[in-house]
């Protein structure tokens, strides 16, 4: 990813660093509208995810996470920006005339060919079952349920590693550091997700953050007591508690929130590192 720095003419360009190469020109048959009337709200209109709202209108790009066009070679035609994720997407023209979007693998360029199937080469961008991959392969867009499509390692720069295969399961090390078991019949894509330098971008001003649909985050200690348990006091007062809590009074910063009896508890060999 090429980071473009502007001349220092205004505060926004003085502090900003954006990607100047990838543009967006989606195909009409691969996009659809989204319903965002109350961002961060549930069906009752109550805020369930704070600091969200506003933002520019978006069109959803239909991404092929299943990669079920078996043994049909496709060619990368474009590499595009997707406002719904921090990874890039690329348009694939398949040999049978079908066109689909997939996540852009790191290092893939326009003109490269990809294919999915059971006996395909271990090449960046190809999709195949875990049972056909050698140990140590870097993968992304990993299925959890067979045929449902990739659900793991889909963010920009994400990559997992196949570290073992035994019986009907394969052992993966995920980007979070978690080590877990997945069926060997599930498929994944070889390589790493592109746009690795997404964290190097600097928005430069608060307005650019609002375009993304993100609102300001206010500390509880500067609020009033009616708004947050940390609020109140004269001047810069401490929180007045032994440990910090959430706006609803539950313990924060360290309390484990995962349910103890989840079905995947036996599949996780090592918890993710924090």
UniProtKB/Swiss-Prot annotation:
Transmembrane segments: none annotated. One of its GO terms (biological process) is mitochondrial translation. Residues 1-21, 224-252 are annotated as: Disordered. It holds the Pfam family Ribosomal_L2_C. One of its GO terms (molecular function) is transferase activity. Keywords: Chloroplast, Plastid, Ribonucleoprotein, Ribosomal protein. It is found in: Plastid, Chloroplast. It comes from the Eukaryota. One of its GO terms (cellular component) is mitochondrial large ribosomal subunit. Part of the 50S ribosomal subunit. Belongs to the universal ribosomal protein uL2 family. This is Large ribosomal subunit protein uL2cz/uL2cy. It comes from Olimarabidopsis pumila (Dwarf rocket). The gene is rpl2-A.
């Amino acid at each position: 990813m090429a980071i473009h720095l502007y001349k220092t003419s205004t505060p926004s360009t003085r502090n900003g660093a954006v990607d100047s190469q990838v543009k967006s020109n989606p195909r009409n048959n691969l996009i659809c509208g989204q319903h965002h009337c109350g961002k961060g709200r549930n069906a009752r209109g109550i805020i369930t995810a704070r600091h969200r709202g506003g933002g520019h209108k978006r069109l959803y790009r239909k991404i092929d996470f299943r990669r079920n066009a078996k043994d049909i070679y496709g060619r990368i035609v474009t590499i595009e920006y997707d406002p719904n994720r921090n990874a890039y997407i690329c348009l694939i023209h398949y040999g049978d005339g079908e066109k689909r979007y997939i996540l852009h693998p790191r290092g893939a360029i326009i003109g490269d060919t990809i294919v999915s199937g059971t006996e395909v080469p271990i090449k960046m961008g190809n999709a195949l079952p875990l049972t056909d991959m050698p140990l140590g392969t870097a993968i992304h867009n990993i299925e959890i349920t067979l045929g449902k499509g990739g659900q793991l390692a889909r963010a920009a720069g994400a990559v997992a590693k196949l570290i073992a295969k035994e019986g009907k399961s394969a052992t993966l090390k995920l980007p979070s550091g978690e080590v877990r078991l997945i069926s060997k019949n599930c498929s994944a894509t070889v390589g790493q997700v592109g746009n690795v330098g997404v964290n190097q971008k600097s928005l430069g001003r608060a307005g650019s953050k609002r375009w993304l649909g993100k609102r300001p985050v206010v500390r509880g200690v500067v609020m009033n007591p009616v708004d947050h348990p940390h609020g109140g006091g004269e001047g810069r007062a401490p929180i007045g508690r032994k440990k910090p809590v959430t706006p609803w009074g539950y313990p924060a910063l360290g309390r484990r929130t995962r349910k103890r009896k989840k079905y995947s508890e036996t599949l996780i060999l090592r918890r993710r590192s924090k």
